[in-house]
Design a protein with these regions (language model features):
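Extracytoplasmic/periplasmic beta-strand context in beta-sandwich domains
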Residues: 2, 15, 81, 96-97
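Residues that mark the start of a beta-strand
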Residues: 2, 26-28, 141
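Extracellular beta-rich ligand/substrate-recognition surface
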Residues: 4-12
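Glycine-rich beta-strand-centered segment in the early N-terminal region that forms part
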Residues: 20-35, 48-89, 112
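Cytochrome P450 core scaffold surrounding the K-helix E-X-X-R motif
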Residues: 39-45
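NAD(P)H dinucleotide-binding glycine-rich loop of Rossmann-like/cofactor-binding domains
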Residues: 63-64, 83-145
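Mid-domain Rossmann-like dinucleotide-binding core that forms the NAD(H)/NADP(H) cofactor-binding site
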Residues: 117-192, 197, 210
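A glycine-rich helix->loop->beta "capping" turn
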Residues: 202-210
């Protein structure tokens, strides 16, 4: 199978390696969609960490991936089902053709819809967990700093959880426009406006309940 591998700083090569075999409690997943986490962008554009060793493991760095089960040794999943899988640290990363997924690190997604959209459930799950730690959001004013993928997930979830006002803050106008589509009631561009003053005006002086 094909697998991507970071062989030296900022260099990714495609290698042909053996397709993995699976153990009990695992499924072999033919991966079809991948998403690049912000924490992985640095491998192409950011600093090189001194503790990193090359070549890195096959499939790294990628931990947001989804596909269809082609072989199963799990009582919980069957061939043909579509899943999101979270790669573990003791196996390959997600930039591979086939991945041996542990059933405890897999989640079913519906048969309908594009996997490229369903895969966003993976980072959004982190956001959902964070929102659960906040307690009730109902009727509160919530400020979301940044409207990248994680920020937009926060905007969408708190808007649907009953927040009174969802205030998106980002220096990029196109991201603020997406914030509105995802549920922001107000937007602030910190390059143009003083954030504290804008918040005070929006919230009648009380600022935010949650930020």
């Amino acid at each position: 199978m094909f697998a991507a591998r970071i062989t030296s700083p900022k260099k990714i090569e495609i290698e042909d390696i053996e397709t993995p075999t699976i153990k009990e409690g695992q499924c072999l997943i033919k991966l079809e969609r991948w998403s690049v986490c912000g924490s992985d962008i640095r491998h192409a554009y950011g600093p090189v960490m001194p503790e990193e060793e090359y070549p890195m493991r096959h499939g790294g760095a990628c931990h947001e991936c989804a596909g269809t089960i082609v072989e199963s040794k799990s009582d919980k999943f069957k061939v043909g089902q579509r899943v999101i899988v979270l790669p573990s640290q003791d196996g390959p990363g997600g930039l591979v053709e086939y991945y041996p997924g542990d059933e405890s690190r897999m989640a079913l997604v519906p048969d309908h819809g594009d996997l490229g959209e369903w895969i966003l459930c993976q980072p959004s799950g982190t956001v959902l967990y964070s929102c659960q730690q906040m307690g009730t959001i109902l009727g509160k004013d919530v400020v979301v700093m940044g409207q990248g993928s994680i920020g937009l997930s926060f905007t969408a979830i708190v808007a649907r959880a009953g927040a009174r006002r969802v205030i998106a803050v980002d220096p990029l106008d196109y991201r603020l426009e997406w914030g509105k589509k995802f549920g922001a009631t107000h937007t602030i561009n910190p390059d143009r406006d003083n954030v504290d003053e804008a918040l005070a005006e929006i919230t009648d002086g009380k600022l935010a309940d949650i930020s």
